[in-house]
Design a protein with these regions (language model features):
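Short, aromatic/His-centered strand-loop micro-motif at the edge of beta-sheets
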Residues: 142-165
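Short tryptophan-centered beta-strand motifs in secreted/extracellular beta-sheet-rich domains
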Residues: 85-87, 162-171, 176-180
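Ligand-recognition surfaces built from glycine- and aromatic
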Residues: 199-261
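Short carbohydrate-recognition loop motifs
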Residues: 36-60
Length: 261
């Protein structure tokens, strides 16, 4: 009720929609995840996502997937729409035994081999229930084009209690560019054999890209063109790799696109 104007405003929520009392646009998902495990941080401007405390428990932030609930789902974020997504996440004080992912996918699964088309940032401390990398310390950028997989090693070593501002920008040619904390990083155009979980894979480093691309434009190479007309969904998630709860803070997630393709 607006006492100044005497106006009574009533909002009607869609029947069956999840957790609309908390947030009209987002919900939390994942193995053993509940709304009680998503809380406002007492120390920083963020939502704290905690896993429930068992191995492979997950905490995933997603747009409400109910039809008609939010523009985050009602609007299509297609690869042909010049989509730009960004978010700010903060790692916890303990970054062992966990997997973190943030970006654009078809499903909320952290496994790279699940989605044939995707573009997201990924960190994993080990290969258990995940992908086997030759190096488990950096942020990777993973994107897939109709089942062909690309893996970029950003060279950024993931640190505890640290803010990471991620941005993915897909241009009019459907080529992705990536930014971390305001700095652009090159994206490989060289495909790996495939993600299968067990086979060890190596991400193309920034130095390798610069050598084959241009040392004077070492951080500006875009990725290969993504498949046309693929509608992606923004997800941010964390999965515990042992019996201890894992957590991550999310300050914001934003997305935009061309009004008409």
């Amino acid at each position: 009720i607006d006492l100044g104007s005497g106006t009574l405003t009533v909002k009607v929520f869609k029947a069956g929609s999840t957790a609309t009392g908390k947030n009209n646009n987002f919900e939390v998902l994942g193995t053993n995840m509940t709304t009680a495990l998503a809380t406002r941080s007492a120390t920083i401007a963020a939502i704290n996502l905690n896993t429930a405390g068992a191995d492979q428990d997950q905490a995933i932030l997603a747009p409400h997937l109910d039809s008609g609930q939010t523009a985050w789902t009602g609007v299509k974020w297609g690869t042909e729409n010049q989509v730009e997504w960004e978010a700010l996440v903060r790692t916890s004080s303990a970054i062992d035994n966990q997997k973190v992912w943030a970006g654009l996918k078809l499903t909320n699964d952290q496994l790279p081999q699940t989605d044939a088309d995707q573009a997201y940032f990924y960190f994993s401390t080990d290969a258990t229930n995940g992908q086997n990398f030759d190096d488990f310390t950096p942020w990777y950028f993973i994107y897939s084009v109709n089942g062909t997989d690309y893996l970029t090693n950003t060279g950024i070593t993931v640190a505890a209690s640290t803010n990471y501002h991620f941005k993915i920008s897909i241009d009019s040619d459907r080529k992705p560019s990536i930014f971390v904390n305001g700095r652009q990083y090159s994206v490989t155009q060289t495909a790996i054999t495939a993600f299968d979980g067990s086979t060890e894979v190596s991400g193309t480093t920034q130095a390798t890209i610069a050598t084959s691309y241009s040392a004077t434009n070492a951080n500006t190479q875009k990725g290969a063109a993504m498949k046309n007309d693929i509608d992606l969904i923004p997800y941010i998630g964390i999965e515990a790799g042992d019996g201890a709860a894992a957590s991550i803070d999310v300050s914001y997630s934003t997305i935009s696109r061309l009004l008409f393709e």
